Every structure is written in C-alpha cells, then in structure tokens.
Amino acid sequence: MSKYTILDKINTPSDLKLIPESQLKILSAELRAFLVDTLDVSGGHFASSLGATELTVALHYVYNAPYDNIVWDVGHQTYIHKILTGRKDKLVTIKKDGGISGFPKRSESEYDTFGVGHSSTSISAALGMAIADRLQGKSSNTVAVIGDGAITGGMAFEALNHAGGIKEDILVILNDNEMSISDNVGGLSAHFSKIISGGFYNSIREKGKEVLKNIPPIFEFVKKVETQTKGMFVPANFFEDLGFYYVGPIDGHDVTELVKTLRILKDHKGPKLLHVITKKGKGYTKAESDPIKFHHVAPSFHSGENITTKISKPTYSNIFGDWICQKAAKDKRLVGITPAMKEGSDLIRFSQLYPHRYFDVAIAEQHAVTFAGGLACQGLKPVVAIYSTFLQRAYDQVIHDIALQNLDVLYAVDRAGLVGADGATHDGSFDLAFMRCIPNHVIMTPSDENEAYHMLEFGYEYNGPAMVRYPRGAGIGAEITGSLDLELGKAKIVKQGSKIAILNFGTLLPLAKQLAEKYHATVIDMRFVKPLDEIMLDKVSQTHEIILTLEENCIAGGAGSAVNEYFVAKDLSNKIIVRNFGLQDKFLNHGTKDLLLAQSKLCVENISQELDKLI
C-alpha cells in the first residue's frame, strides 16, 4: 500500500480541489515525504521547497491556475508546484538531460507562467500579466510569490512602486523565512525581523482578538477595519506607504489559515501584500538546522547510500577564496564585495577574518558595482566577487560608473561558461562578449588554477578595471606556484606544431592539447582577451594556414570575434582560414557539462570533423 494515500490522487490542481480542506495538512506532510524520497534519488533544490509546501498547496487550492496567474520568484521553491501541476512522476528527472527544469519554464508547462532563475523579477512580470489580462477583458487573478531575499532587489521595489501607484489588482505574497541562500542583510531584512519578533502591535492584536471573539459583531467589524487602525500602534507600514493593502504576518505553515486568508484576499480588489512567515527546510530536521547546507542536496543525502566522495582538487572558487584571504593579509586597502553569494563565491573565511572589509550587499548587483566604484574613488581596492550570469544585471554600472572613470575595480567572475544542471538561466555564456566592447577593461581567461590565482593578483595590481573569469567546479589540479610569468596582453605558446594553430581562451586547454596531438597543431594559451597579443597573432598568421579559436563563451562577440576583427583590420582574412569554436547562438537546456560542451561542438569529435573538411 502506498504511503501517499492523498497525493496519489493528485496530478493536477483540479484534482487537488477535490480533496477536503481538512486533509490538506496531511497532504502537505505527504508532499514533504515525497520530496525527500525523490531528491534522495535525483538531488536538487530542497530546503526552499520544504519551506513553501503549505503555501503552494493553498495557492493551487484557492486559485484557478493556469487561468489565474501564479508567478514565482527565483524558482528554488517550486518543486511542490511542479508535483501538483502534472510533473510528479517526472520530478526524479529534474535537472537531468531530457528531464524537467529545476526552475519554472514556460515551454515545460502551462502552469509555469513566467520563466525564472534570477531573483526579483516576479512582481514586474505579474503586474504585466495582470494589466494584459484586464485590457483583454479577462477576470483572472494574478499572484506573485517572492522571498525576503529576492525582495531586497531594486527591481522588486520598482514594481511595487508601479503597482501601488496605479492601484492594479495584484497579490504579492512575501514568503519570509529570514534566509534566502545566504543570510539576508540590510535594513529591510532588519525591518522584517522586527515585525516577526512579536512587538507591541502583534501582541495587542492577538490578545484583543481573543477578547473580541466573545462579541462576534464587534470582532467581525474590527477584522474589517484592522488595517486602518494599525497606525494607532505602529509606524506606517512600509508596504502601505507604497499603496498596498498589507495583511500579516501570518503562519506560512498553517494551511487552513492560508486558505482562509487567500480566499478573503481573492475578493479584495487592488494591490495587496500578504506577509507569511515560513521556515526554510520545514519538516526535515537537518534542513531546518542548516538550511544553507540543505539548500541543494546531492543524491543519497537522506539514505546515506552511495555518497559521492568529496572532490580532492580545489574548485576555482576555492582558489579565489584562498587568494583574497592571503592578499587581504598583505594589503589593508582590499575590500571584498558580493551580492548575496558568500558561500558560492567562497568568501566565508574572508568574511570571518576581515568582517569590517567584507560587504554582502544582498541581491543588488547594480549597487555592488557602483559601491565598489565609490570605494575605489577614496583609495581602497575593491574586489567584486560575482557570478557571470549576475554580472549582466549591472551592465550600465560597469560601463558608466567604473569603466568611464577608469576606476580601480577587480571583477572576480565566477561560474563563467556552462554550469550544467542549473541550465540557461545560470550559464555564464555572455560575459566576454558584453565586457570586451567596453573601453579601459583588461579581461583575463585562466587555463588552470595556477593562472587563475596569478591573474587575480595581476588584476588586483593593475591600475584600472580588470576582470578574471573562471568556471564552476574543480580544475585540473595545477599546483599554485610562487610566481608566474604574466605580462599584460601576452600569450604563451604551450606546444609548437605546424599548419594548424589553436588559440585557447580559458579552461578548454586540455581540449586544445588533445586536438594538437591528433593534428600536430600549435597550441597557444592566449590568457588575455583584452588586450589581445597582436604580436602573437601576426606571427601565427604568417606561419600557419588554419587558425582555430576555443572559448567557453558565446561565439558572437566573444574572444574568437576579437581575433577575427584583428585579422580583418590587417587584411589577413583572405590569406588564412579562421574557425571559431564556442557556445552556439542558442540557449542550451540543462544537462551534464560534458554533454552541453558536445552539443556546442566543443569536443574532439566535432572539431575534428570540421578540421578534416579544411585539411
């Protein structure tokens, strides 16, 4: 007999609505158990979905998706949503090749109203949907679900300001668990914590309700006017000042209260915000105790069987973490900045050793970059540790605030290139292209851990904006040497061959070496995308017939394009054959990195096929 007696009856939200409300609590427990059992096989984002279980059940119980729009922010918390919307049997394939996405994806399900993976987008998208439906005569409801981490992003406030200003009928649910991935920081987070802590208003409100319940007519009246009397007890609510009808905070794990509240708010027109308090990792003791560790789990995390051994080689993030701690010990001007990615960027040790020189600015990439500019103006040496996919959110600041003024800022760009299971929303496919066109920048692409370490050092000492991009995961195990012969804009010949030259940008050097063995090709580790080693390019063009460029970045506008531009400017394009190999002009689905590289023709077999046609 199945242990999922209620869940087995549910494949769609229509099935969910047939379940008696009295059984929703049991269903929530079954959903958590199913999530544990499934992710123990597949792995995936875990703690966030545990924390949003009752909220997800209540939303699909009250609202009529997909006619009603439920828009999720970031998407880490949507596994329960996927289970309830026809993907229960596919959950075991999540983030696998050919399986379902780890995030909401419009092409995957009509219930996924808006594709997501980055934060702070839900309110803007939901507002657009609400207005579009209204203009087309639809009577649908629109809900945006956003966490207390994501709501610190500036875009969320822009959308709140717009929605409140035009009085659009939209519900924003603030899922407040006091923790996104890393601990939340900033004034707004402190504001939420103060509300949760049980201040005077919440105390008197609950005690007053107990008394007034004995006088039903007055109790009902007070409930209706409650929001109008808040000012008697507390300062004007932040969200009400933005034009929202504010309700909360309420218990996000009381499914009965959630259903009741959502039904009331469904009939209340205009902008409203429901503030729910949840616990990340709810229902799984270890995840409740350490939600950061259990934010994402590997297969067998629960059963303990076939536990993957730890990676013996350090990751590129570890290399950065070591470098910044060592450099900070030598240079008191160094300050480290991250937009809410302390763990991912390996800044934990730095934050502990140098708390007054460590700044987690929350999910605020634009602010992170300009903040770094301000620090640089006053003589400090800021290092911005940021994922490639998030750097693109601060593009204007990179150009206008840093490059234009030639400020001394080092970008340590993590997760450059393909990231694998997280898919297109998290791939670092574009940074070389969008950074290369900006004046005053130095751009470096290390081929191994040792180059990464010394390029960070070089970029730090360089007087002006500099960027070092490195991939997710471990490298080849290169030893960190005491020094490295590194000169601005100078490449290194790794292997001398003939006829074919392979210009490598980044960590595809092992691939270049494999090709060189097969074709007796010259291999050059270019090291710098900007400035290019033009002397080396001149030499190669004079001594070789075919030139290949390799990069884990989009071909359009990338490092290979820079090589092409140089050869065209020198009138060499008709004298040599140049082929660029990099990421194709399309968004890739999730899968293993090796598979995605092969799909991008970045493997020996595919490149050999192209070479054989040219020889």
UniProtKB/Swiss-Prot annotation:
GO terms for cellular component: cytosol
Protein name: 1-deoxy-D-xylulose-5-phosphate synthase
EC number: 2.2.1.7
Family affiliation: Belongs to the transketolase family. DXPS subfamily.
Binding, thiamine diphosphate: 76, 117-119, 149-150, 177, 284, 365
Subunit structure: Homodimer.
Cofactor names: Mg(2+); thiamine diphosphate
Any Pfam family the entry gives: Transketolase_C
Ligand binding (Mg(2+)): 148, 177
PANTHER family: 1-D-DEOXYXYLULOSE 5-PHOSPHATE SYNTHASE-RELATED, 1-DEOXY-D-XYLULOSE-5-PHOSPHATE SYNTHASE, CHLOROPLASTIC
